[in-house]
Amino acid sequence: MFHQVWAALLSLYGLLFNSMNQCPEHSQLTALGMDDTETPEPHLGLWYFIAGAASTTEELATFDPVDNIVFNMAAGSAPRQLQLRATIRTKSGVCVPRKWTYRLTEGKGNMELRTEGRPDMKTDLFSSSCPGGIMLKETGQGYQRFLLYNRSPHPPEKCVEEFQSLTSCLDFKAFLVTPRNQEACPLSSK
């Protein structure tokens, strides 16, 4: 009798614990797909880097000196090519321009980007529950991180909280939010 009561109490405790510690299902991480007839048009234009998550702080260290980053995604000169230009505003106020070329590759129905000149780097795009938001999962040599971008430089705080909650459930415990205290640097046209 004692064992049955004890088992019932443990089961009740387990149910209560699980109901309070709910992580979203992995299926809530929705990959953005694109087939050969579609264009990446919904993803073109300006994006602001908001936050990042990784397993370790070292995987986010590249963003430590950053105040804000603004990106412009444009169609490339070749099919299935994207041009990404960015301007990084460091915490010390310096503007650092960057540019990358991405190739859209076949990735099991999801939109997978490969960075030219970086064969080890893969980027997957995921939808975000945040209006105007998108999540990227970057995988490279020795790192894996999720990055949150938004069309607005200052999305609702709830967006950042949901991103942190989701990535924490995926065991990405290191978290970084860009301060975005300074004005974004102008994007160069080159």
Curated annotation (Swiss-Prot):
Bridged cysteine pairs (disulfide): C23-C169, C95-C185, C130-C159
Q: Would you indicate the residue range of the signal peptide? A: 1-22
Q: Which Pfam families match?
A: ApoM
Q: What's a GO biological-process term for it?
A: reverse cholesterol transport
Keywords assigned by UniProt? Disulfide bond, HDL, Lipid transport, Secreted, Signal, Transport
GO CC entries: discoidal high-density lipoprotein particle; extracellular region; high-density lipoprotein particle; low-density lipoprotein particle; spherical high-density lipoprotein particle; very-low-density lipoprotein particle
Quick check: keyword Secreted in the entry?
yes
Transmembrane helix among keywords: no
Report a single Gene Ontology molecular function: lipid transporter activity
List of residues binding tetradecanoate: E138, R145
Q: Indicate the principal place this protein occupies in or around the cell.
A: secreted
Distribution of this protein across tissues and organs = Expressed by the liver; secreted in plasma.
Highest taxon, organism lineage? Eukaryota
| Localization per record | Secreted
Which family does the entry's similarity section mention? Answer: Belongs to the calycin superfamily. Lipocalin family. Highly divergent.
PANTHER family linked to this entry? APOLIPOPROTEIN M
Task performed by this protein:
Probably involved in lipid transport. Can bind sphingosine-1-phosphate, myristic acid, palmitic acid and stearic acid, retinol, all-trans-retinoic acid and 9-cis-retinoic acid.
Q: How does it assemble?
A: Interacts with LRP2; LRP2 mediates APOM renal uptake and subsequent lysosomal degradation.
What name appears for this protein in its UniProt entry? Answer: Apolipoprotein M
Q: Which organism is it from?
A: Mus musculus (Mouse)
What is the primary gene name for this protein? Apom
